[in-house]
């Protein structure tokens, strides 16, 4: 594996251990040239997924993009990053287990909203404001009202 600091091609694994219920291997690496230390994660990828965007174009599924969007929603909410990592892994497993080579960004968004609703209402509202493209304060009011009544659009994630 290439060193992220000096770009040297050959690094050594100093420690390997399973994490996330055995679905990921965490490796601590060290560069023999610059001495830089870094962590890599190895996980099984069942299939390549394509995301169908609202615009009609396709792009490869990007786990890191999903993670960044959830991290933005939970920022400053005191939620354990390891827990968020497990949530993201669960969402990815759900997507892969659908058996479909392509999935709409809408379905991904619904899965994320369902997960966030069970974690933190504020994170749910933050994500919903982007996912649902809120335009004014009444949009926030509506989703808060839905939350208080227990109504969400995540109930039927995969009903077509």
Curated annotation (Swiss-Prot):
This is Transcriptional repressor NrdR. Residues 49-139 form the ATP-cone domain. Coiled coil: none annotated. One of its GO terms (molecular function) is DNA binding. GO terms for biological process: negative regulation of DNA-templated transcription. Belongs to the NrdR family. A zinc finger (unnamed) spans 3-34. Negatively regulates transcription of bacterial ribonucleotide reductase nrd genes and operons by binding to NrdR-boxes. Binds 1 zinc ion. Its cofactor is Zn(2+). Keywords: ATP-binding, DNA-binding, Metal-binding, Nucleotide-binding, Repressor, Transcription, Transcription regulation, Zinc, Zinc-finger. InterPro entries: ATP-cone_dom (IPR005144), NrdR-like_N (IPR055173), RNR_NrdR-like (IPR003796).
């Amino acid at each position: 594996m290439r060193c992220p600091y000096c770009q040297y091609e050959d690094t050594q694994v100093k420690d390997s251990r399973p994490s996330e219920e055995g679905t990921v291997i965490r490796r601590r690496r060290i560069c023999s040239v610059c001495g830089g230390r870094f962590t890599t994660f190895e996980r099984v990828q069942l299939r390549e997924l394509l995301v169908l965007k609202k615009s009609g174009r396709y792009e490869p599924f990007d786990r890191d993009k999903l993670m960044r969007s959830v991290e933005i929603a939970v920022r400053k909410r005191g939620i354990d990053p390891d827990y968020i990592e497990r949530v993201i892994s669960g969402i990815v497993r759900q997507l892969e287990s659908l058996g479909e080579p392509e999935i709409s960004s809408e379905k991904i968004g619904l899965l994320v909203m369902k997960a966030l609703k069970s974690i933190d209402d504020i994170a749910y509202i933050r994500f919903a404001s982007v996912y649902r493209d809120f335009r004014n304060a009444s949009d926030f009011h509506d989703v808060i009202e839905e939350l208080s009544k227990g109504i969400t659009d995540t109930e039927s994630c995969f009903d077509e």
